[in-house]
Design a protein with these regions (language model features):
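Conserved G1/Walker A P-loop phosphate-binding module
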Residues: 1-78, 86
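Helical mechanochemical/support elements of P-loop NTPase systems and associated helical scaffolds
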Residues: 42, 46, 50, 80-90, ...
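Canonical P-loop GTPase G-domain recognition
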Residues: 120-123, 128-184, 191-193, 222-231, ...
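C-terminal effector/interaction modules appended to NTPase cores
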Residues: 1-2, 11, 19-25, 204-408
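Conserved C-terminal guanine-recognition region of P-loop GTPase G domains, centered on the G4
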Residues: 52-60, 79-151, 181-184, 207-223, ...
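Short, flexible loop segments at the rims of nucleotide/cofactor-binding pockets, characterized by
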Residues: 41, 71-76, 99-103, 171-173, ...
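Long, well-ordered amphipathic alpha-helical subdomains in the mid-to-C-terminal portions
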Residues: 185-213
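G-domain G4 guanine-recognition motif of GTPases
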Residues: 67, 98-101, 120-136, 152-160, ...
Length: 408
């Protein structure tokens, strides 16, 4: 991610779905007024979901996702369809594209019903209408209106109704829920200390995304941000004329930082703030006590929303399993997932421990949490789990009164 661009997780995600050769890629090019997607008469040109970050007026920053055809064939086709289905879990808006010259198929109607079942804001787009005479257009419109009034006859070739479609997409933009990282916890000129370890896993020349976002949120709310490594924390606190309003640490440094920061100073972590921002913190706190019941052989899934090169002291694959073994005095079986890969079937797991989800948009993070809940599998968070195992969970959520009540 460039430091000058909106993070992917903060963009409105628009998924483009439909059968092969429905005109999904040509529609994307028409909507964006750019040749972003490869267009071909050959079926199956798009073999994997393709993500395109851009500005789309009047929406603003968006992530457009071009998906493989949902009627793909063969073993590889089934895998491509599964990838397209995964995209449904992260979309804020879905466009179902139908080749108007072919008409609505039963598969199209089934997918539309699936979109409605997910309560996903959707538009039915009847593309290639330049191939139909007025009578056939009228008949197709009547059939489509039986499914939804939110349908458009468009032509990606002539740009017919493309502007109207863009306006309709903008009107479907999800109403933003006012969630804060920490802006509601501080006042102007409050001091916030950010503890950001620089170790072998840290990216070269920049802070990781949660640290960037929290730092920006402090500045946006007129706070005073002091950023240090764990090794300089004690000296930084000693030099401050006033105690900080809040200390935010990387979760993996929770144990050491909690010993340095006076008990009178509120302390939390980037991961906890990120889970709060994504709306999954309450369920993560309620789930963490499952660690008390872990036994030998229990399966624990540790899941990250991004993919990165694993280091020898990687938090997900090395440190967390080590802390869990030490805390539980047991030998559970650890499984791992990263990026877009998150199991559909979670029933085999005693517990899911998920990262803060900075690289996932709110809808996908909520989808993962809801999937776990539907299968009665507790899902907690890196920061919550680490704080709990270090005996400082109450302290780490004390700055968040609504969450702190869950531990009373």
């Amino acid at each position: 991610m460039s430091l000058n661009t909106t993070p992917a997780a903060e963009r409105t995600h628009i998924g483009i779905f439909g059968k092969r050769n429905a005109g999904k890629s040509s529609l994307i090019n028409a909507i964006t007024s750019q040749e972003l997607a490869i267009v071909s008469e050959q079926k199956g040109t798009t073999t994997d979901p393709v993500y395109k970050a851009m500005e789309l007026l009047p929406l603003g920053p968006v992530m457009i996702i071009d998906t493989p055809g949902l009627d793909d064939e063969g073993k590889l086709g089934a895998q491509r369809i599964a990838k397209a289905q995964q995209v449904l879990n992260k979309c804020d808006i879905a466009l179902l594209v139908v080749d108007a010259s072919v008409g609505l198929s039963e598969a199209d109607k089934a997918l539309w019903q699936q979109l409605q079942a997910k309560k996903l804001p959707s538009i039915l787009v009847l593309n290639k209408v330049e191939l139909l005479d007025e009578m056939r257009q009228a008949l197709l419109t009547m059939e489509a209106m039986k499914l939804t009034k939110q349908c458009f006859l468009v032509s990606a070739i002539t740009n017919r109704n493309i502007n109207e479609l863009k306006e309709a997409i903008a009107a479907l933009r999800p109403r933003e829920v006012e969630r804060q990282l920490l802006g509601d916890l501080i006042k102007p000129c409050d001091i916030v200390v950010l503890v950001t370890p620089i170790d072998s896993a840290a990216p070269k020349g920049r802070l990781i995304l949660p640290q960037q976002q929290v730092l920006r949120n402090v500045l946006d709310n007129k706070g005073i941000a002091v950023t240090v490594q764990e090794s300089e924390l004690a000296e930084a606190l000693a030099r401050l004329a006033f105690p900080p309003k809040l200390v935010v640490t990387d979760s993996q440094a929770f144990g050491a930082v909690s010993k340095i920061v006076p008990p009178t100073v509120p302390l939390t972590s980037f991961s906890i703030l990120m889970a709060r921002y994504k709306g999954t913190l309450s369920s993560a706190v309620e789930a963490v006590r499952v660690l008390d019941t872990v036994q030998d052989g229990d399966k624990i899934l540790i899941s990250e929303g991004c993919t990165h090169h694993r280091q020898c002291q990687d938090i997900g694959t090395v440190k967390l399993p080590g802390w869990i073994r030490s805390f539980t005095k047991a030998e559970p079986e650890f499984c791992f997932s990263s990026g877009t890969e998150f199991p559909e079937d979670l029933s085999q797991y005693k517990l899911v421990v998920h990262c803060g989800g900075c690289m996932l948009n709110e809808r996908e993070m909520q989808s993962r949490s809801e999937r776990a809940a539907a299968q009665n599998v507790p899902m907690t968070n890196y920061g919550i789990a680490i704080a709990y195992m270090h005996g400082i969970l109450k302290r780490s959520v004390a700055p968040l009164p609504d969450i702190a009540k869950l531990l009373e």
